[in-house]
Amino acid sequence: MLQGIRILAMAVTGLCAVNLLYSQSNETKQNSADLLRTFKTIYVQSKTPLAKPQILAGELQKNASFDAWGLSITSNPGADVVVEIDHQPGWFYYTYAMTHQSSSIVLAVGRVNAWDGKQASARIAREIMKRVARVRNPPTQH
């Protein structure tokens, strides 16, 4: 009798553990499309003095969809996403990466060719907004 109770208790404990693991994995399963659809705040940082964060922030805000999607630039490094700009000295290209903070999922990454940080910021802003538009304004099916 005692052996049967122990087996039953172990079975119940095992089922509870499996249920807990399953519920946690469903909650944490996020993909880049879901994150691109739902983020609201953006923090911009630059690893180069050639491209100021304020210039990229301004270029992002120029896009008509920026306000329509309810996006905001913040000076808080704890924003939903961080956009980081860098420049390779001696070359005319700038790299960027947009990362979702809480999940560490990279949402966009790329490189643009530009003579200076202002031109690079404009091109990076266009690339980022195109990436977001693919999930927020999907093409209609006919």
Regions picked out by a protein language model, each given a short descriptive name:
Residues 1-11:
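Bacterial N-terminal signal peptides that target proteins for export
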Residues 9-19:
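Bacterial N-terminal signal peptides
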Residues 17, 65-67:
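Short, structurally constrained coil/turn elements
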Residues 24-42, 48-65, 99-142:
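C-terminal/domain-edge helix-coil "capping" segments
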Residues 34, 72-75, 88:
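Short secondary-structure boundary/capping segments within folded domains
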Residues 45-46, 84:
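Solvent-exposed beta-strand motifs enriched in subsets of small alpha/beta binding domains
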Residues 67-79:
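Short acidic low-complexity segments
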Residues 77-112:
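Mid-chain, structured segments of secreted extracytoplasmic proteins
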